[in-house]
Protein backbone atom coordinates (compact mmCIF):
# COMPACT_ATOMS: atom_id res chain seq x y z
CA UNK A 1 0.00 0.00 0.00
CA UNK A 2 1.19 3.50 -0.80
CA UNK A 3 -0.10 6.74 0.63
CA UNK A 4 -1.59 7.63 4.00
CA UNK A 5 -4.00 5.53 6.05
CA UNK A 6 -6.89 7.42 4.41
CA UNK A 7 -5.76 7.11 0.78
CA UNK A 8 -7.41 3.74 0.19
CA UNK A 9 -9.86 1.68 2.20
CA UNK A 10 -7.89 -1.55 1.89
CA UNK A 11 -9.13 -4.17 4.33
CA UNK A 12 -6.50 -5.30 6.86
CA UNK A 13 -7.95 -8.83 6.58
CA UNK A 14 -6.26 -9.12 3.15
CA UNK A 15 -2.95 -9.33 5.01
CA UNK A 16 -3.95 -12.81 6.21
CA UNK A 17 -3.88 -14.13 2.61
CA UNK A 18 -0.47 -12.53 2.08
CA UNK A 19 0.79 -14.16 5.27
CA UNK A 20 -0.44 -17.58 4.10
CA UNK A 21 1.39 -17.00 0.80
CA UNK A 22 4.64 -16.00 2.52
CA UNK A 23 4.52 -18.99 4.88
CA UNK A 24 3.91 -21.42 2.01
CA UNK A 25 7.54 -20.82 0.99
CA UNK A 26 9.41 -23.03 3.45
CA UNK A 27 12.86 -22.37 1.98
CA UNK A 28 14.15 -20.31 4.92
CA UNK A 29 13.20 -18.92 8.33
CA UNK A 30 11.22 -15.70 8.11
CA UNK A 31 10.51 -12.48 9.89
CA UNK A 32 7.23 -11.07 8.55
CA UNK A 33 6.07 -7.55 9.35
CA UNK A 34 2.38 -6.74 8.87
CA UNK A 35 1.51 -3.05 8.95
CA UNK A 36 -2.19 -2.81 9.63
CA UNK A 37 -4.19 0.38 9.26
CA UNK A 38 -6.51 -0.51 12.12
CA UNK A 39 -9.01 1.86 13.69
CA UNK A 40 -7.92 5.21 12.31
CA UNK A 41 -10.61 7.85 11.98
CA UNK A 42 -13.09 7.34 10.39
CA UNK A 43 -13.32 3.86 11.97
CA UNK A 44 -16.52 3.14 10.03
CA UNK A 45 -14.41 3.14 6.85
CA UNK A 46 -12.20 0.42 8.33
CA UNK A 47 -14.95 -2.12 8.94
CA UNK A 48 -15.67 -3.03 5.31
CA UNK A 49 -18.14 -5.93 5.73
CA UNK A 50 -17.34 -6.59 9.41
CA UNK A 51 -20.53 -6.72 11.54
CA UNK A 52 -21.18 -3.88 13.98
CA UNK A 53 -23.05 -5.13 17.06
CA UNK A 54 -22.62 -1.87 18.98
CA UNK A 55 -24.90 0.42 16.95
CA UNK A 56 -27.84 0.16 19.35
CA UNK A 57 -25.75 1.15 22.37
CA UNK A 58 -23.39 3.87 21.11
CA UNK A 59 -23.30 6.72 18.60
CA UNK A 60 -22.29 5.47 15.13
CA UNK A 61 -18.56 6.37 15.06
CA UNK A 62 -17.97 5.10 18.59
CA UNK A 63 -19.83 1.89 17.68
CA UNK A 64 -17.60 1.56 14.61
CA UNK A 65 -14.49 2.03 16.74
CA UNK A 66 -15.62 -0.75 19.10
CA UNK A 67 -16.42 -3.01 16.14
CA UNK A 68 -12.96 -2.29 14.70
CA UNK A 69 -11.41 -3.54 17.96
CA UNK A 70 -13.53 -6.70 17.65
CA UNK A 71 -12.24 -7.05 14.08
CA UNK A 72 -8.64 -6.64 15.29
CA UNK A 73 -9.18 -9.34 17.91
CA UNK A 74 -10.50 -11.67 15.21
CA UNK A 75 -7.59 -10.80 12.91
CA UNK A 76 -5.02 -11.65 15.58
CA UNK A 77 -6.83 -14.92 16.35
CA UNK A 78 -6.82 -15.89 12.67
CA UNK A 79 -3.16 -14.91 12.32
CA UNK A 80 -2.25 -17.04 15.33
CA UNK A 81 -4.12 -19.96 13.74
CA UNK A 82 -2.28 -19.51 10.43
CA UNK A 83 1.07 -19.45 12.22
CA UNK A 84 0.21 -22.60 14.17
CA UNK A 85 -0.79 -24.44 10.97
CA UNK A 86 2.35 -23.47 9.05
CA UNK A 87 5.09 -23.37 11.65
CA UNK A 88 6.44 -25.64 14.34
CA UNK A 89 8.13 -22.64 15.94
CA UNK A 90 6.80 -19.11 15.74
CA UNK A 91 6.31 -15.93 17.72
CA UNK A 92 3.87 -13.12 17.03
CA UNK A 93 4.20 -9.64 18.50
CA UNK A 94 1.39 -7.09 18.15
CA UNK A 95 1.47 -3.46 19.21
CA UNK A 96 -0.08 -0.21 18.07
CA UNK A 97 1.90 2.94 17.30
CA UNK A 98 -0.61 5.09 19.17
CA UNK A 99 -3.96 4.92 20.88
CA UNK A 100 -7.16 6.69 19.98
CA UNK A 101 -9.35 8.80 22.21
CA UNK A 102 -13.09 8.39 22.19
CA UNK A 103 -15.40 11.22 23.21
CA UNK A 104 -18.85 12.51 22.46
CA UNK A 105 -17.43 15.45 20.46
CA UNK A 106 -18.01 16.25 16.78
CA UNK A 107 -14.94 14.11 15.97
CA UNK A 108 -15.54 11.30 18.48
CA UNK A 109 -12.62 9.01 17.56
CA UNK A 110 -9.31 10.84 17.29
CA UNK A 111 -5.70 10.89 18.43
CA UNK A 112 -5.34 13.09 21.51
CA UNK A 113 -1.81 13.74 22.73
CA UNK A 114 -3.08 15.12 26.03
CA UNK A 115 -4.70 11.98 27.49
CA UNK A 116 -3.15 8.71 28.62
CA UNK A 117 -5.27 6.72 26.17
CA UNK A 118 -3.36 8.28 23.29
CA UNK A 119 -0.28 6.33 24.37
CA UNK A 120 -1.57 3.34 26.34
CA UNK A 121 -1.61 0.60 23.72
CA UNK A 122 -1.61 -3.16 24.03
CA UNK A 123 1.50 -5.27 23.55
CA UNK A 124 0.43 -8.82 22.72
CA UNK A 125 2.80 -11.74 22.34
CA UNK A 126 1.87 -15.28 21.32
CA UNK A 127 4.31 -18.03 20.47
CA UNK A 128 4.37 -21.74 19.78
CA UNK A 129 6.07 -22.39 23.13
CA UNK A 130 3.86 -20.16 25.28
CA UNK A 131 1.50 -22.44 27.20
CA UNK A 132 -0.23 -20.07 29.62
CA UNK A 133 -1.80 -16.61 29.64
CA UNK A 134 0.13 -13.95 31.49
CA UNK A 135 -0.91 -10.32 31.84
CA UNK A 136 1.37 -7.41 32.73
CA UNK A 137 -0.33 -4.20 33.80
CA UNK A 138 2.75 -2.00 34.25
CA UNK A 139 3.84 0.46 31.60
CA UNK A 140 6.50 -0.70 29.15
CA UNK A 141 8.19 2.05 27.19
CA UNK A 142 8.24 1.80 23.40
CA UNK A 143 11.97 2.53 23.51
CA UNK A 144 12.34 -1.09 24.67
CA UNK A 145 10.87 -2.44 21.43
CA UNK A 146 14.23 -3.35 19.86
CA UNK A 147 15.18 -5.24 23.02
CA UNK A 148 11.80 -7.02 23.10
CA UNK A 149 12.26 -7.95 19.44
CA UNK A 150 15.69 -9.41 20.22
CA UNK A 151 14.36 -11.31 23.25
CA UNK A 152 11.54 -12.80 21.18
CA UNK A 153 13.44 -13.66 17.99
CA UNK A 154 16.87 -14.55 19.29
CA UNK A 155 18.40 -12.06 16.85
CA UNK A 156 21.25 -10.21 18.59
CA UNK A 157 23.14 -6.97 18.04
CA UNK A 158 26.05 -5.49 19.95
CA UNK A 159 24.36 -2.27 21.05
CA UNK A 160 20.94 -3.45 22.27
CA UNK A 161 20.27 -5.67 25.26
CA UNK A 162 17.38 -8.15 24.98
CA UNK A 163 14.40 -7.03 27.09
CA UNK A 164 11.88 -9.53 28.47
CA UNK A 165 8.64 -7.56 28.96
CA UNK A 166 7.36 -10.15 31.43
CA UNK A 167 10.23 -9.87 33.89
CA UNK A 168 12.63 -7.05 33.03
CA UNK A 169 12.10 -3.71 34.74
CA UNK A 170 12.69 -0.31 33.17
CA UNK A 171 12.99 2.30 35.89
CA UNK A 172 13.20 5.25 33.51
CA UNK A 173 10.02 7.36 33.49
CA UNK A 174 7.88 6.85 30.41
CA UNK A 175 8.00 10.04 28.35
CA UNK A 176 5.63 10.81 25.46
CA UNK A 177 5.44 13.54 22.85
CA UNK A 178 2.12 15.34 23.32
CA UNK A 179 2.32 17.18 20.00
CA UNK A 180 4.35 20.03 21.47
CA UNK A 181 7.00 18.56 23.77
CA UNK A 182 8.05 15.45 25.68
CA UNK A 183 6.13 15.04 28.94
CA UNK A 184 5.89 12.27 31.55
CA UNK A 185 3.11 9.86 30.55
CA UNK A 186 1.82 9.91 34.14
CA UNK A 187 1.23 13.68 33.88
CA UNK A 188 -1.48 13.20 31.25
CA UNK A 189 -5.11 13.06 32.30
CA UNK A 190 -6.94 9.72 32.12
CA UNK A 191 -9.48 9.12 29.37
CA UNK A 192 -13.05 9.35 30.71
CA UNK A 193 -15.26 6.35 29.97
CA UNK A 194 -18.06 6.66 27.45
CA UNK A 195 -20.95 4.64 28.82
CA UNK A 196 -23.43 2.95 26.49
CA UNK A 197 -26.76 4.61 25.81
CA UNK A 198 -29.68 2.82 27.36
CA UNK A 199 -32.06 3.34 24.48
What are these regions (language model features)?
Residues 127-130, 135-166:
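Non-catalytic, well-ordered alpha-helical segments in soluble enzyme domains
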Residues 71-110, 149-153:
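Metal-dependent active-site segment of extracytoplasmic phospho-/sulfohydrolases and closely related
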Residues 1-81, 102-103, 111-143, 176-199:
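Catalytic-adjacent loop/helix segments of enzymes that bind and process anionic phosphate/sulfate esters
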Residues 28, 88, 154-158:
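Generic structural signal for secondary-structure transition and capping sites
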Residues 169:
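Short Asp/Glu-rich motifs
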Residues 92, 172-173:
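Localized sequence-composition bias
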Amino acid sequence: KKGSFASRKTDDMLLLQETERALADKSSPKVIFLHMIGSHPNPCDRLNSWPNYYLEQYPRKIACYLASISKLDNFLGQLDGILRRHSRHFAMLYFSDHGLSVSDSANPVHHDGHVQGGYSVPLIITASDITSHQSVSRKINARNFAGIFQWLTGIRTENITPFNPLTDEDNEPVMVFNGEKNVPADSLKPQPLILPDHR
